[in-house]
């Protein structure tokens, strides 16, 4: 029980991170449609996120080793929040591609920092149990993110601000 309490903030953080980034993709798609982006442009914007995610997967371990779990997480969350907040300020195709690369990179690095921290904190006896709780929180965040789309208004600054607040 004490282990669960010690990692509960981390588990809630994972859920919120997944909520914020999970809602960004659909919000970007709906906003891009309203802005008149072509279907190909919308697809490229979506792919840009995963391009950044792949880059983050390769670069994250070195960053975590170099600066530590907490600093790596904080820097990448700040990058993600900045990229989210820039969407309504620069509503252009190339800017959104760049922002989505940044969010993908940031999320991959954030997940790497969290998961490696958990691996370091947990023991062989409780790792499976706590990683199942971790995945449950992760998936709950993704599920809630899809429900957020109902209240988020495409292109509105407020919608992107809400996602940035959730990511904080």
PLM features: what roles do these ranges have?
Residues 78-91:
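C-terminal ends and interior cores of transmembrane alpha-helices
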Residues 109-122:
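Intracellular juxtamembrane helix-capping segments at the cytosolic ends
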Residues 3-50:
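Helix-loop boundary and gating motifs at the non-cytosolic
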Residues 160-168:
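Symmetry-related core transmembrane helices of the 12-TM Major Facilitator Superfamily/SLC fold
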Residues 68, 89-94:
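Helix-breaking motifs and short loop linkers at transmembrane-helix boundaries and internal kinks
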Residues 56-68, 153:
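Helix-to-loop junctions at the C-terminal end of transmembrane segments
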């Amino acid at each position: 029980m004490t282990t669960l309490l010690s990692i509960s903030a981390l588990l809630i953080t994972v859920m919120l991170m997944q909520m914020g980034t999970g809602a960004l993709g659909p919000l970007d798609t709906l906003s891009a449609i309203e802005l008149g982006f072509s279907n190909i442009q919308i697809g490229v914007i979506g792919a840009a996120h995963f391009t950044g995610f792949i880059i983050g997967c390769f670069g994250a371990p070195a960053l975590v080793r170099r600066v530590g779990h907490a600093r790596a997480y904080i820097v990448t969350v700040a990058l993600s929040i900045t990229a989210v907040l820039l969407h309504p300020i620069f509503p252009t195709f190339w800017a959104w591609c760049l922002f989505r690369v940044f969010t993908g990179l940031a999320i991959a690095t954030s997940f790497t920092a969290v998961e490696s921290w958990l691996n370091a904190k947990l023991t062989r006896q409780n790792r499976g149990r706590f990683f199942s709780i971790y995945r449950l929180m992760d998936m709950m965040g993704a599920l809630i993110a899809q429900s957020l789309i109902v209240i988020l208004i495409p292109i509105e600054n407020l919608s992107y601000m809400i996602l940035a607040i959730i990511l904080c």
